């Protein structure tokens, strides 16, 4: 006997829930931080994103120190959820945690960790429409 997957709020509300998350990828972003040293290896770090908190953030990650900033992978992370970011090469993942306005991007915990220092957080954006009071 199979079990049907449960969706938040049932059928009709699920469509709205799904649309909200689809819209996050296309929403307007507010630049909160740029890594001034994005051409150097990056271990673990905490970034103060200012006084305006967001429920959702977009974190852009470079795959290598030598990559031009236009070649980044954008990751959406949500406050209160277990999140990680990646640059889509070598399957290197970094855990993201929140503490007030501080966002900590940790050292990689999976993938080809022999080259982890090359997966570099580049920019953090707040996603408009998810502002917290």
Regions found by a protein language model. Give the residues of each.
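Compositionally biased, intrinsically disordered/low-complexity regions enriched for serine, proline
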Residues: 2-5, 66, 105, 118
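Generic cytosolic/nucleocytoplasmic N-terminal low-complexity/intrinsically disordered segments
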Residues: 12-18, 61, 73-74, 81, ...
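Hydrophobic beta-strand residues in large extracellular and virion-surface proteins
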Residues: 17, 32, 47, 57-59, ...
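Enriched but not universal
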Residues: 1-26, 32, 125-133
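Intrinsic-disorder/low-complexity loop/linker signature
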Residues: 10, 18, 23-24, 51, ...
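Intrinsically disordered, low-complexity segments enriched in proline/serine/threonine
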Residues: 7-10, 71, 110, 123
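Extracellular jelly-roll beta-sandwich "head" domains, especially the C-terminal globular C1q domain
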Residues: 86-133
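Beta-rich globular "head" domains
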Residues: 23-83
